[in-house]
Amino acid sequence: MSQSFELVSQYKPQGDQPNAIRQLVAGINEGKKHQTLLGATGTGKTFTMSNVIQQVNKPTLVIAHNKTLAGQLYSEFKEFFPNNAVEYFVSYYDYYQPEAYVPQSDTYIEKDASINDEIDKLRHSATSALFERNDVIIVASVSCIYGLGSPEEYKELVCSLRTGMEIERNDLLRQLVDIQYDRNDVNFTRGTFRVRGDVVEIFPASRDEQCIRVEFFGDEIDRITEVDALTGEIKGERNHVAIFPASHFVTREEKLKRATKSIEAELEERLKELHDRGKLLEAQRLEQRTRYDLEMIHEMGFCSGIENYSRHLTLRKAGETPYTLLDFFPDDFLIIIDESHVTIPQIRAMYNGDQARKGVLVDHGFRLPSALDNRPLKFEEFEHKVHQAVFVSATPGPYELEHTPEMVEQIIRPTGLLDPVIEVRPIEGQIDDLIGEINERVAKNERVLVTTLTKKMAEDLTDYLKEVGIKVRYLHSEVKTLERIEIIRQLRLGTFNVLVGINLLREGLDIPEVSLVAILDADKEGFLRAERSLIQTIGRAARNANGYVIMYADRMTKSMQIAIDETKRRRSIQEEYNRKHGITPKTIEKRIPDVIKATAMVAEDGEEYTSHAPKQKMSKKEREAVIERMEAEMKEAAKTLNFERAAELRDLILELKAEG
C-alpha cells in the first residue's frame, strides 16, 4: 500500500532547521550517498530528520547505538508520525550469554538467553510492516546488522486469506504450522492458533491484543473479522488479511532436506580434516553434537542453536553475506545513523568480536566451520547495502569527515538557547565548591549532572552527597538498559536532583531541567576527556536557559581548549542570530513521553551486586534482591566476554531460586 508520510506537529521549522532540511532533501534527491548533519545538542535534530523523511517520502531505517537511545527516538518519531508505521527493532534478549569455550580451563558454556516477548512482537511488527506499506520508519539498535532469515522466504510463506476464497480448513491449519504457528486451544497467545468447529482464530506474531477470526462455510472462507483476543469483541470486518510467519527463520520442507544433506557433507569433510590433524577428541565431540542436531531437524524441523546452520538453511556459499533487516527494505530506502561518531565504530567492531568467540568453538569441535557464517555484517558489507545515508552528530567522527567533507550545520536552536558558558576552576576544594553550586540549582528547582573518571570516585561522591542531604543517584554500567529510561524520568520529575555517572554520554540524556554540568578531573587526557566527549558532555547543559558548565582542572589540555573554542564559536553564532531576530532564550519544554511497554517493568533498586550469594538464611524479599543484583552482574559479565564469571553467577542464581 502506497502512502505518504504525514508529519504532525504544532511547531514549524525555525533557526537553522529550514536551511538544514532544504540542503539534506536536495542532497538525497541529487542521489548523494552520504551526508552529515552537524547538529549541536538541543537544535531539534529529530524534528529536522522528521521533516526530511516527510519530504523525500522513502522507507527509513534509523540506527542508534543503544536500546535507551533507540527507545527515546522511537517515542519521538511515533509522536511526529501518528498515522504512519513507526516500528522498533532491537535485540530481543533481556539477557544473552553466548555459547563459548574457554580452552585454558577446558570450560564449555552453553548458550543461555531470556527473550523479551514485547520486543519480539515489535520486531515482527517491523518486518511485516515493510511488506505491507511504504510509509515505514524503523528505529533500530546496531543489532539490525545481525543475521535474520531470508526476506524472500519470509514473504513467500505469508498466508494470504480473502473472503470468498476456496481453501479447506485443514489446509489452512497445515499452512499455519508450516510458518511456525502452534495450535493451542487453551493458552491463546502470540504465534498460536485455535480451532472451534468451522472457526479458526489466529494470533499474529506482530500483535498482542487483537487476533484474526476466520469463519468457514464448507471449503470457503465466509467471513474474516478482527477480534479482541481477551474479550472476544469484534473490532472490525476484513476482506483480506496477511498472516506473516511466526519466526524470521522459516524454511520450506524441501529446503530443509537440502540443508541437512549439505550439513552432512560439511561434517564428513570436517571430520576427515580433524582426523588427519590428530584431533580425535574434537572430531568425536563434533560428530556427536552435529548428528544429534541433524536428528532433531529431521524429527522436529528445528534444533537448539539452529541459527549456527543458517548458511545451509538459506543455501548460501561459504563467506557469503548473511541476510539482515536491511534486506527486508526495498532498494530505494534511507538510513539515518544517529550519534554517528559512536554508532559507526560500533558497527565496524561487531564482526571481529563475533568471529573471535566462534573461532574458538570451531577449533575445538563444538561447531562446524559454517557457524562462522551466522554473523553480523562486515563493515564493507554494511557500506555496500547502504543506498543513501545521513549521519547525525554534534561531533562527527573520522569516517563522516572523510565521506562528507561539506557538512550541513545546525547550530541555531529554535528556542534561542545558547551553548552554555564554560568556567574552569581548580581541583583543590572541588567537592565543597560543587556542593555550593548544587544547592544553588536545587533552590531554583533545576537539576545537575556530575561526571567523574572512576567508579570508586563516583560511588564515594554519591555517598558523600547523600550524607550532606542532597538527593542523588549514581548511574552505573550495570543498571539494566531499560531501567536507565526510568532513572532519567525520575530525575526529570524531581524524585532526585543530582545524577552522578562516569560516561553520561551514552544515555542520550536530553534533560531540559539540567542547568549545571560539572566535569571533575577535566584535565586527565583519555577517552572520557577527549574533545568529542567533552563537547558532548557540555551539550547536556544546552537545553536550559541557565545552562552552565564547570570544568575542574589544574591545567588546560588541548582537548579542553578545542572543546571550549568550539562551544564559544557556536555561542557567538547563536547570540548574533538572537540579536538579529529579537529572540530571548527560553528553556526547552519537553513533556515526559510514554515509553515502550517493555521499559515500564524496571527494578526499584539500582545498586550493584559485587559479592557471592550469602549462605545464611534470607527472607524471600532479601533473596529476590540478591538474585536481581546477581543477574545484573551476570549480564555485564556476558557483555564483556567474561563467560566463566557469567556462568558461575548463573549457577548461583539457579541455586538461590531453587532454595526459594
UniProtKB/Swiss-Prot annotation:
Q: Which family does it belong to?
A: Belongs to the UvrB family.
Q: Can you state the subunit structure given in the record?
A: Forms a heterotetramer with UvrA during the search for lesions. Interacts with UvrC in an incision complex.
Cellular-component GO terms for this entry: cytoplasm; excinuclease repair complex
Motif Beta-hairpin: where? Answer: 92-115
Q: Which residues cross the membrane?
A: none
For this UniProt entry, the molecular function terms from Gene Ontology, in alphabetical order, are: ATP binding; ATP hydrolysis activity; DNA binding; excinuclease ABC activity
What domain of life does the native source organism fall in? Bacteria
Descriptive protein name: UvrABC system protein B
Q: Where in the cell is it found?
A: Cytoplasm
Which UniProt keywords are present, listed alphabetically? Answer: ATP-binding, Cytoplasm, DNA damage, DNA excision, DNA repair, Excision nuclease, Nucleotide-binding, SOS response
Q: Which SUPFAM superfamilies match?
A: C-terminal UvrC-binding domain of UvrB (SSF46600), P-loop containing nucleoside triphosphate hydrolases (SSF52540)
Where does this protein come from, organism-wise?
A: Halalkalibacterium halodurans (strain ATCC BAA-125 / DSM 18197 / FERM 7344 / JCM 9153 / C-125)
